[in-house]
Design a protein with these regions (language model features):
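Short, acidic, small-residue-rich periplasmic hinge/interaction motif at the N-terminus
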Residues: 1-25, 33
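Extracytoplasmic beta-strand/coil segments of soluble accessory domains associated
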Residues: 8, 36-79
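N-terminal periplasmic accessory domains that precede
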Residues: 32-35, 39, 59-62, 91-93, ...
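Short acidic/polar hinge/loop motifs at secondary-structure boundaries
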Residues: 78-107
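Short loop/turn motifs that connect adjacent beta-strands in outer-membrane beta-barrel proteins
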Residues: 130-133, 160-161, 210-214, 257-261, ...
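Transmembrane beta-barrel wall of Gram-negative outer-membrane proteins
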Residues: 132-135, 143-261, 266-268, 381-384
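Outer-membrane beta-barrel transmembrane domain signature of Gram-negative proteins
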Residues: 283-380, 609-635, 648
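C-terminal beta-signal and adjacent terminal beta-strands/loops
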Residues: 497-499, 605-608, 650-656, 679-747
Length: 747
């Protein structure tokens, strides 16, 4: 059960959204990226839709909009290696839907259970286990000016002695160019808004019962992707991204006296990533482009034992004790290409960092009131206590507790509450004393003569960063009324106070005047030019001079600088988010079949950032490029015999376009998805069709364009930025998909 390390308990304390493989099929979900993009609690700032060169085709999970690095992603309950240019997030795009049994989304802080990163929540992808037979999948999808294809094969065997499952999937996507959509036709050609991708994925899961009470288990995965996109905003650049990930787990479980069970396992996860940015040598001062590469590795040894402690009148008190030793390392570097597209061997932005982590954890579940001692007003009462202590070799220790209370005053009503502390260790890439570049800016400064000054600004990392910390609490109510036993309604309130966040306090650019202004940055009015030269040497790059477009028409030199603006990463930012989640399901018989209704909605009451205690609070919800205040997904699925159909809607509420002068309202966006399935069951269909399931899915049935936002045009070079919010909208339009799934033998 995601959210607890104790076997055999019904984890009702923290809210968990569970989506089964059957539901994924009904909704026509073709990839894990599609799943998280439609999740109302997720904010899509890292996805294929962004068209970001550094992560083309990658998909990260960003619960509550607190950043992909603040959501822990697990595969079968274990960590994956980080990906991206700085190892800043876990790329889930390589996990095929065909290999999944279910997806659990825990929308609560969980560092007491899982350790670092579980601040906004946890997403746990659970692989299929008990399956007999073979399954072949083929899917083709079409949208205007683009096609995608998927083929997959799964083999499984399950007996009393053990089980094994092997799954492979290949996918190909043509991508999408800006000139293929009316709302981006003004972009300079060529320009890619969705990358072209090809991907291979393979997964294995197995277990063997050596004797009664002794089992060995293993799982393994491999994924490789190639993505291509063209960026022509500043200069023509073909970006080719080639990530590869692999890993596995080997362990054993043994039954102990008294109903206890012990587990020992070792796991490893690796992620390699290369980005080749090819330019036209004659138009780029540094030649033919650049390459960025990094490798992230995680290996761990885990031991735990859980079982019953003693009995109370309300039930059995259960506990788990465990320990973990983990090693992580990160290595990354960049280099330029010459006119022949060969490496110049002029490495810059080097990063090579490693650390080890030792952890101890414990958890106790105590049912105080149960069926045997229920009373009026207290039908059930239980508490959960958990704590995890971690010792990091690079920044120190962290102790994170969590407490949960669950109370049922009526058989149909359950009230729950949690409180806990969580943390996030700094990224290894952040702890390298590295300067990415040094910029020279025309800076708005009210304390300088004329209200402006020439500033030199180092941008990069620092090695003295500390861990980020958070306190979170939630309360909720679950309702299953006796008069409607098929109704299951859950509502939760969440509140996360997130301090010491690592970030770059970068200045903002005023697009009206192309001037930079404080947002907020530590400014040194007296500085040593030798320190600036040290920053330049660390970067390995020439000075990045932005004063070529200064309002007075003068391009300044480094010697003209009168300010040093320190834009290196700091631990000064704080964030706070609060809101409501609603999850409702209701099933009923209809027309000799079954109708299932569902709604999942998320509403932000507030979300705010503060870059330091001396700076004003910035609202970060209901504005462009930030989480929408309200998102919801709901629909109806009806099935009868071999046939099923469903209609789902996805809604994003209206929000503010703060770029417009004056600010304006961006309209809400509502899409409809329709699917139809027919299953040729064995014994009721010709042999060739027996075990075949046909699925037709239409996403965005009415081909609705994303809401328009104000188009930003740089006055000097005509560069254009997307006229839609890629974090809150999707440029694909209507997508029609046909899938054929065939089962061979088994069950």
């Amino acid at each position: 059960m995601t959210g607890s390390n104790i076997r055999g308990i019904d984890q009702k304390f923290s809210p968990v959204i569970t989506t089964t493989r059957e539901e994924l099929d009904r909704r026509g979900i073709a990839s894990t990226g599609d799943y998280v993009a439609q999740l109302p609690q997720n904010f899509n700032n890292i996805s294929a839709d962004t068209g970001s060169g550094s992560v083309a085709g990658a998909v990260g999970v960003n619960l509550r909009g607190l950043g992909t690095e603040s959501t822990l992603v697990l595969l079968n309950g274990r960590r994956l290696a980080s990906a991206g240019a700085e190892g800043a997030f876990t790329d889930i795009s390589g996990i095929p839907v065909s290999a999944l049994e279910r997806v659990d989304v825990l929308t609560d802080g969980a560092s007491a259970i899982y350790g670092s990163d579980a601040i906004a929540g946890v997403v746990n992808f659970i692989l299929r286990k008990d399956y007999n037979g073979a399954e072949t999948r083929m899917r083709v999808a079409h949208m205007a000016d683009s096609d995608s294809y998927q083929v997959g094969q799964t083999f499984g065997i399950s007996t009393e002695r053990g089980r094994a499952l092997l799954s492979y999937e290949y996918s190909s996507d043509d991508g999408l160019d800006a000139n293929d959509r009316s709302f981006t036709k003004d972009f300079p050609d060529p320009y890619t808004i969705l990358p072209k991708t090809k991907q291979h994925s393979a997964f294995f899961s197995g277990a063997l019962n050596l004797t009664d009470g002794l089992e060995v288990f293993s799982d393994a995965f491999w994924s490789s992707r190639k993505s291509e996109q063209t960026n022509n905003l500043y200069l023509t650049s073909l970006n080719v991204s080639e990530p590869e990930s692999r890993g596995g787990t080997l362990g054993g479980r043994v039954d102990l006296p008294g109903g206890w069970q012990a587990e020992l396992s070792g796991s490893v996860a690796q992620s390699d990533w290369n980005l080749w940015a090819y330019t036209i040598p004659s138009t780029h001062e540094w030649g033919a482009g650049s390459v960025r590469t990094n490798a992230s590795n995680v290996w761990s040894l885990d031991a735990k034992a859980d079982g019953a402690l003693f009995d109370l009148r309300g039930g059995t008190v259960r506990a788990v004790l465990g320990a973990q030793y983990r090693e992580e390392d990160y290595d990354g570097w960049s280099d330029f290409l010459d006119v022949n597209y060969d490496l110049l061997d002029q490495r810059y932005s080097d990063a090579d960092k490693a650390r080890n982590v030792s952890a101890l954890f414990a958890e106790v579940y105590a049912p105080l009131v149960g069926a045997s001692n229920a009373m009026t007003g207290v039908k059930e009462l239980a508490v959960s206590l958990a704590a995890r202590y971690e010792d990091y070799s690079d920044f120190g220790t962290s102790l994170n507790p969590k407490v949960g209370v669950m109370w049922s005053p009526l058989d149909s009503v359950t009230l729950r509450a949690t409180y806990g502390r969580s943390f996030r260790a700094p990224l290894l890439s952040n702890l390298v004393d590295r300067i990415n570049y040094v910029a020279l800016l025309d800076y708005l400064d009210p304390e300088s003569p004329g209200g402006r000054a020439v500033a030199v600004m180092p941008v990069g990392n620092r090695s003295d960063l500390d861990a980020e910390k958070s306190r979170s609490w939630s309360v909720g109510i679950d309702w299953q009324p006796a008069f409607a036993p098929r109704l299951d309604a859950r509502m939760s309130y969440f509140d996360i106070d997130y301090t010491g966040r690592v970030g770059v306090p970068f200045p903002e650019l005023n697009f009206a005047t192309f001037e930079w202004y404080d947002h907020p940055l530590p400014v040194q009015r007296t500085f040593d030019m030798a320190e600036v030269q040290r920053f330049l040497a660390l970067s390995g790059l020439p000075l990045n001079n932005f004063t070529w477009n200064s309002p007075d028409g003068v391009e300044y030199e480094l010697s003209d600088a009168t300010l040093l603006v320190d834009a290196r990463m700091t631990n000064t930012q704080t964030s706070r988010v609060s809101g409501l989640d609603l999850d409702v399901g209701y099933g009923l018989p209809l027309a000799d079949g079954h109708l299932q209704l569902s709604v999942n909605a998320a509403y932000f009451i507030d979300a705010e950032d503060q870059f330091s205690s001396l700076r004003p609070v910035v609202r970060k919800v209901g504005r462009m490029f930030t989480p929408a205040r309200f998102r919801a997904m709901g629909g109806a699925s009806w099935s009868r015999g071999a046939m099923s159909t469903s209609l789902f809607t996805r809604h994003t509420g209206s929000y503010t376009d703060q770029q417009a002068v004056p600010s304006s309202k961006i309209s809400s966006w509502t899409l409809f998805d329709l699917s139809f399935q027919y299953h040729f069951e064995r014994g009721a269909a010709p042999a060739l069709l027996a075990g075949t399931k046909l699925s037709l899915t239409v996403q965005n049935v009415f081909d609705k364009d994303p809401p328009r936002i104000s188009m930003i045009v740089a006055p000097t070079a005509g560069e254009r930025f997307a006229p839609y919010d890629a974090q809150n909208a999707d440029p694909q339009g209507r997508v029609i998909a046909l899938q054929i799934m065939k089962e061979w033998g088994g069950r």
